[in-house]
Regions:
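A detector for short, charged/polar N-terminal pre-domain segments
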Residues: 1-7
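N-terminal core-binding DNA-recognition domain of tyrosine recombinases/integrases
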Residues: 10-25, 31-95
Length: 95
């Protein structure tokens, strides 16, 4: 996986800090949640993983992995919110 993901994540976190008026705690949680998803992608892929390769089935597979780790419903809901917001941002900036 290339550095594009990390660059986009950094840009996204700066965006939500500057425009969405979210708490530093939320930014920290979102960073951790999205980085956990990126690590999931890294484990699945042997090469670069493109933004447009993420689909509903892959997202469901990731969420199933969270359920398998016995995360609370609140934690899973926050993960979903973080990923939804991140991918909406990626669409908005036309990645």
């Amino acid at each position: 996986m290339n550095d594009d993901w990390q660059i986009r994540l950094t840009q996204y976190l700066e965006y939500i800090q500057g425009t969405k008026n979210v708490s530093p705690h939320t930014v920290s949680n979102y960073r951790r949640d999205i980085e956990q998803f990126l690590e999931f992608l890294r484990r699945l892929s042997t090469g670069d993983f493109m933004f447009n390769a993420v689909d509903v089935l892959l997202a469901r597979r990731y969420l199933a992995s969270l359920v398998g780790k016995d995360y609370s419903r609140k934690t899973i809901a926050r993960n979903i919110a973080a990923l939804r917001s991140f991918f909406r941002y990626l669409c908005r900036v036309q990645v």
